[in-house]
A protein has these predicted regions:
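Feature captures hydrophobic
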Residues: 1-124
Length: 124
């Protein structure tokens, strides 16, 4: 088994997941303003963590990412929706190259328009 995907004995906490999402969105600040303007459009992004029963929400745009907040739902669905387990989320945040592998192996599900998927591909 690949060491990156080695199972943990306990699932991650809500706080660890929030920090992992902040790490992922923080990578956008490393992009230059021109790249952000070219590749990012204003989109609500949600990440549902199935084993914790939580959903986190942020907003991406040419200025970067907004704060990551826990949501109880009730609002309109985000334009880009990720679904994963807590430990897989931590792995994706720790290893930038694991995003595509997680998606290809079914550990990460993505619901988005074709347009948004193409933009995500350029970022990841």
């Amino acid at each position: 088994m690949d060491a990156v995907w080695e199972a943990r004995w306990t699932m991650a906490t809500a706080e660890e997941c929030r920090k992992a999402l902040e790490t992922l969105t923080g990578r956008l600040s490393e992009m230059g303003p021109e790249d952000r303007a070219a590749h990012l459009v204003d989109r609500d992004i949600s990440c549902r963590v199935t084993d914790l029963g939580l959903t986190f929400l942020t907003r991406l745009g040419s200025g970067g990412a907004g704060p990551v907040t826990e949501t109880t739902g009730g609002g309109p669905p985000a334009q880009v929706r990720f679904t994963t387990k807590s430990d897989d989320l931590l792995t994706i945040a720790a290893d930038p190259g694991s995003f595509a592998r997680a998606w290809l192996t079914g550990r990460l599900k993505i619901e988005a328009s074709v347009f948004d998927l193409l933009r995500l591909r350029k970022l990841l």
